[in-house]
């Protein structure tokens, strides 16, 4: 930041979202946005780098020579043995509840932004409909789960100035993502592995698996993908 490297540690939690403090200036930074909220660097934002929400199985498959960071030998003693999700669910959220909401505060969503437009895709809808095809702003979007049902990625559906319509072809082993125009097959990395478009790659888009209350707090004007959701609150 500004030509120097900052070193961070956990300073606290705001609405169940980490607040980090840098040792160099004492500025506090919000985890979800990477932006400074209090201190000399308030208003500045860290550059976002690509990240992945995948299981180690998927990561190892795509990066067979990967290294693994070994945890400190005494790290376990700093963590409670109880189920973290059940433990954290005891604490209230501070996000105002809209009676018109069709999602509960702790429902999981996939959050995606395109320019100034944000949209939340309920995890239950993705599991039921995988993949989800949508358009967000000017971006034709693919929201995709791997066959493990846990690993998540999002892609721009445009290839060579053409927008692809993609679907999951079952009845083959393993199932494959196929575009309806050319019949090309695509893997979870976004690479076309067979067909006329073999070798082409879909552009990755950042997406975040998050709780609804957290996503809505920091994206108050977010839209919600409602196809397949039950009606009512």
Model-derived features: where do they sit?
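Mid-to-C-terminal functional-domain signal that highlights helix-capping/loop sites
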Residues: 1-233
């Amino acid at each position: 930041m500004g030509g120097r490297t900052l070193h961070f540690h956990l300073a606290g939690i705001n609405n169940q979202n980490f607040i980090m403090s840098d040792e160099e200036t004492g500025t506090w930074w919000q985890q979800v946005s990477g932006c400074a909220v209090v201190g000399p660097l308030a208003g500045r934002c860290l550059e976002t780098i690509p990240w992945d929400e995948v299981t180690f199985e998927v990561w190892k498959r795509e990066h067979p020579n990967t290294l693994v960071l070994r945890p400190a030998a005494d790290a376990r003693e700093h963590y409670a043995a109880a189920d973290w999700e059940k433990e954290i669910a005891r604490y209230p959220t501070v996000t105002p509840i809209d009676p018109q909401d069709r999602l509960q505060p702790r429902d999981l969503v996939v959050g995606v932004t395109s320019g100034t437009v944000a949209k939340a895709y309920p995890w239950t809808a993705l599991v039921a409909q995988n993949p989800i095809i949508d358009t967000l702003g000017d971006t034709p979007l693919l929201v995709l789960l791997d066959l493990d049902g846990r690993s998540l990625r999002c892609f721009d559906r445009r290839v060579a100035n053409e927008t692809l319509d993609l679907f999951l072809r079952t009845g083959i082993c393993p199932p494959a993502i196929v575009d309806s125009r050319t019949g090309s097959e695509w893997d979870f990395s976004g690479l076309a592995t067979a067909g006329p478009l073999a070798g082409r790659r879909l552009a990755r888009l950042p997406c975040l698996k998050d709780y609804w209350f957290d996503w809505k707090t920091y994206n108050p004007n977010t839209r919600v993908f409602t196809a397949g959701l039950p009606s009512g609150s």
